[in-house]
């Protein structure tokens, strides 16, 4: 698999699902471009492209709650990436282990 085939456009963003390496829980969803993916592989710190700030964002650079990259897999369409990582603290900005888990509707 060639990174240039996945990111045929340097500005293209793909969803990145972050999964706890050990528990397999989903921790968060972010977006990666080619540059943030390369930085993740080089630094072993999960790095996203912030759509609101229009720049790279390494998870934990402000809070210290880094996500340490372990491995990745692309889906069958090569338009979503699953990243396995370990966290150095709460993943969510609300100081929770995961950004997921809030149930608003009970059926």
Model region roles, listed by residue range:
Residues 1-13:
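Short, basic/aromatic recognition patches
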Residues 4, 15, 69-71:
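Short, acidic/polar N-cap/turn motifs at the starts of alpha helices
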Residues 11-33:
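Active-site and channel-lining beta-strand-loop segments
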Residues 22-23, 34-37, 78, 88-90:
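Short, charged/polar surface micro-motifs in flexible loops or helix N-caps
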Residues 34-48:
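A short, polar/charged loop-to-alpha-helix boundary motif
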Residues 46-102:
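Short, structured beta-strand-loop surface elements
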Residues 105-107:
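Conserved small/polar residues in nucleotide/adenosyl-binding loops
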């Amino acid at each position: 698999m060639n990174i240039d085939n996945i990111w045929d456009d340097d500005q293209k963003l793909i969803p990145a699902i972050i999964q706890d390496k050990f528990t397999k829980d989903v921790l968060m969803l972010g977006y990666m471009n080619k540059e943030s993916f390369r930085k993740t592989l080089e630094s072993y710190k999960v790095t996203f492209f912030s759509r609101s700030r229009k720049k790279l964002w390494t998870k934990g650079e402000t809070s210290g709650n880094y996500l340490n990259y372990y491995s990745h897999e692309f889906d069958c369409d090569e338009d979503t990436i699953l990243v396995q990582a370990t966290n150095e603290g709460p993943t969510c900005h609300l100081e929770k282990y995961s950004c997921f888990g809030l149930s608003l509707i009970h059926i």
